[in-house]
């Protein structure tokens, strides 16, 4: 996803930006509901669409259903204010076509998921 957002910022068009804005708007709307996770992933899916790379898009679509199930089961996607802020900042950086800053922010945004995956790999 770090490379996907970099490419999205570099390659996105007006249609992609509108889709990202709509996904972000829905994420905000459903933030305090159980639907938050699906709208969170819709935002990430819109980033994959906007990068115009079919491999990134296909890979994300393959893993999303399983990741969503794990997130909901283990409740690792608890609402935090930094998630809202990070999504807003990512959208702004994409609109500015700043791929490097967007990629750095995505890496930070996904660090909790990386840490969770490492713990799961080390668990008996």
Question: Would you name each region that the model predicts?
Answer:
Residues 122-124:
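…primarily DNA-binding HTH/wHTH and HhH modules…
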Residues 1-73, 82-89, 101-116:
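Conserved amphipathic alpha-helical segments that form helical-bundle/coiled-coil interaction surfaces
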Residues 119:
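Alpha-helical DNA-recognition elements
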């Amino acid at each position: 996803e770090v490379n996907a957002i970099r490419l999205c910022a570099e390659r996105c068009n007006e249609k992609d930006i509108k889709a990202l804005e709509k996904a972000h708007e829905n994420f905000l709307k459903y933030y305090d509901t159980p639907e938050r996770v699906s709208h969170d992933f819709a935002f990430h899916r819109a980033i994959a669409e906007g990068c115009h790379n079919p491999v990134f898009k296909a890979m994300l679509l393959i893993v999303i259903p399983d990741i969503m199930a794990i997130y909901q089961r283990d409740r690792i996607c608890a609402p935090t204010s930094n998630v809202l802020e990070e999504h807003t900042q990512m959208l702004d950086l994409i609109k500015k076509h700043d791929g490097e800053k967007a990629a750095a922010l995505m890496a930070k945004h996904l660090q909790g998921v990386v840490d969770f995956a490492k713990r799961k790999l080390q668990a008996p």
